[in-house]
């Protein structure tokens, strides 16, 4: 058990970071195992509430892949992914929107409010927050040819209107956002939550983007637990993707970090959401954790 002196030392260590990030917007992409394990849910959302109480402006963009997959199984539909993105036909899109907006989003809002924060749930369709066009994914065949794959109602964000989020922040609430966008004809699009978080972070002029995932960060060699890449420069990314060091679902996470950096976000981080209070460890301690992706 920590002594009072050890607890005081922790607070003293955090003070410079509380001052540094006071009044700053920090976008958190909430996903992975941290959305499934009840104690981790509590830890992540408690972190967000604490951040708000010390003067920061946390914004949560959540995923929901496992719960979507489970719901699709219930109705007898298989899940298929291309380049880390879910192939989404019309029926699947209805289920995606139902799960993300109707179930997960409201559950997060309810828990934050119970912990002691004040949260407001939004989807990308509210006030035209995320406007999108159909996205096509480039894939490489076993023969090495590059082809374009049709992945259905998966959208690419064409415009972000952050005013509704800024208004919610200004009124003292924590925005919680489901990554569903609206198309030119009013159709719904499934947006990868990593991309949504990156684009929103840039549009808000956020100081930091944090992406929670189910690994320690980006590993140079996944068979070697000691090969964590603590700092990754943008110029190194294409080579790591080509070599397969960055692949699958990690590709959109890294790409969204690069997009956010290009849009003016100061720092981006990929953290292990399985570690309790990983967000606080990154923000309020000298060492930090995970992989920082920088220009």
UniProtKB/Swiss-Prot annotation:
BP-aspect Gene Ontology terms: arginine biosynthetic process via ornithine; L-arginine biosynthetic process
The protein's name in its UniProt record: Acetylglutamate kinase
Record-stated family: Belongs to the acetylglutamate kinase family. ArgB subfamily.
Gene coding for it: argB
Catalytic activity field: N-acetyl-L-glutamate + ATP = N-acetyl-L-glutamyl 5-phosphate + ADP
EC number(s) recorded for this UniProt protein: 2.7.2.8
PANTHER family on file: N-ACETYLGLUTAMATE SYNTHASE, N-ACETYLGLUTAMATE SYNTHASE, MITOCHONDRIAL
GO cellular component: cytoplasm
UniProt keywords, alphabetically: Amino-acid biosynthesis, Arginine biosynthesis, ATP-binding, Cytoplasm, Kinase, Nucleotide-binding, Transferase
Higher taxonomy: Bacteria, Bacillati, Bacillota, Clostridia, Eubacteriales
InterPro entries from the UniProt entry: AceGlu_kinase-like_sf, AcgluKinase_fam, ArgB, Asp/Glu/Uridylate_kinase, Glu/AcGlu_kinase, NAGK-C
């Amino acid at each position: 058990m920590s002594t009072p002196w050890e607890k005081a030392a922790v607070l003293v260590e955090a003070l410079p970071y509380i001052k540094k990030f006071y009044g700053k917007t920090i976008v958190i992409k909430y996903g992975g195992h941290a959305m499934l394990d009840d104690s981790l849910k509590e830890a992540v959302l408690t972190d967000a509430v604490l951040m708000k109480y010390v003067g920061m402006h946390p914004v949560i963009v959540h995923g929901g892949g496992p719960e979507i997959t489970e719901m699709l199984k219930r109705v007898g539909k298989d899940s298929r992914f291309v380049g880390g993105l879910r192939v989404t036909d019309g029926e699947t899109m209805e289920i995606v929107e139902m799960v993300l907006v109707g179930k997960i989003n409201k559950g997060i809002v309810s828990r934050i409010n119970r912990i002691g924060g004040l949260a407001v749930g939004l989807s990308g369709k509210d006030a035209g927050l995320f406007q999108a066009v159909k996205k096509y994914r480039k894939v490489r065949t076993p023969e090495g040819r590059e082809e374009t794959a049709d992945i259905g109602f998966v959208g690419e964000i064409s415009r972000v209107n952050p005013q509704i989020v800024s208004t919610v922040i200004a009124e003292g609430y924590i925005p919680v956002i489901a990554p569903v966008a609206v198309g030119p004809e009013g159709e719904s699009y499934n947006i990868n939550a990593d991309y949504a978080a990156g684009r929103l972070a840039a549009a808000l002029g956020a100081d930091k983007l944090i992406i929670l995932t189910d690994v320690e960060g980006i590993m140079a060699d996944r068979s070697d637990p000691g090969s964590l890449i603590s700092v990754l420069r943008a110029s190194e990314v294409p080579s790591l993707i080509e070599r397969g060091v960055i692949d699958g679902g990690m590709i959109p996470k890294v790409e969204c970090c690069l997009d956010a950096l290009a849009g003016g976000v100061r720092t981006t981080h990929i953290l292990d959401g399985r570690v309790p209070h990983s967000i606080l460890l990154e923000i309020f301690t000298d060492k930090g954790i995970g992989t920082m992706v920088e220009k």
